[in-house]
Amino acid sequence: MGSKTEMMERDAMATVAPYAPVTYHRRARVDLDDRLPKPYMPRALQAPDREHPYGTPGHKNYGLSVLQQHVSFFDIDDNGIIYPWETYSGLRMLGFNIIGSLIIAAVINLTLSYATLPGWLPSPFFPIYIHNIHKSKHGSDSKTYDNEGRFMPVNLELIFSKYAKTLPDKLSLGELWEMTEGNRDAWDIFGWIAGKIEWGLLYLLARDEEGFLSKEAIRRCFDGSLFEYCAKIYAGISEDKTAYY
């Protein structure tokens, strides 16, 4: 009876299934609770991980959800609405060139605007309403935001336990590609493309000198503090280029 109970307890906590090799190759972390309280609990205001259990030091949330914080950098006039020209300006502040910024801004506002509008009629100006940004969340993503725009710490940690094969806290370009492939939902073509574009842009923005994207850069991208930091670097206000490596 004892051995049967032990077997049931072991199976109940297993993260690898013998006949599902993918569960072996994409490991789940089981050691989060010691440094990150309740890693499974969605965080509305902060983006914590094991190394930063209280989120980004000094980053103000202003009562916004983590997903709202992620996009608020591009709200240049701080009125809760992001127009294409503001997206363009934000991209330029991050160091993207004119042509790239024009294309990226057009794609972002064209694809995200309608879902965030307060009514049914489309707008010719393609605004993105920050208070409705959770409605623009697409499939085939990392699930690090939940459907209400809260941050899921456990899913950030799973990105690295599953896909960081070279270094435990960094992803290579190939590992990023493998992650976006692993995130794909069936027949979700828009989500497949959107995921690769988003992660590709983040890689261009925040990769280190060795071509890796660090966990800290990714975490700070989720709460938007990375954009503020990179804008200061590009403007020459800050010289510390290693804060998120």
Curated annotation (Swiss-Prot):
Q: What is the lineage of its organism?
A: Eukaryota, Viridiplantae, Streptophyta, Embryophyta, Tracheophyta
Q: How is its activity regulated?
A: Inhibited by beta-mercaptoethanol and the organophosphorothioate terbufos.
Q: How does it assemble?
A: Homodimer.
Q: What is the effect of changing residue 116 to V?
A: No effect on molecular weight
Top-rank lineage group of the source organism: Eukaryota
A Gene Ontology CC term for this entry?
A: monolayer-surrounded lipid storage body
Give the Pfam families listed for this entry: Caleosin
Keyword Metal-binding attributed: yes
Indicate what this protein is called per its UniProt record.
Peroxygenase 1
Q: What is the effect of changing residue 221 to G?
A: No effect on activity
Q: Which residues form a coiled coil?
A: none
What does its PTM field state? Answer: Phosphorylated. Partially phosphorylated at Ser-225, but not phosphorylated at Ser-72, Tyr-145, Thr-166 or Ser-172. Phosphorylation is not required for catalytic activity.
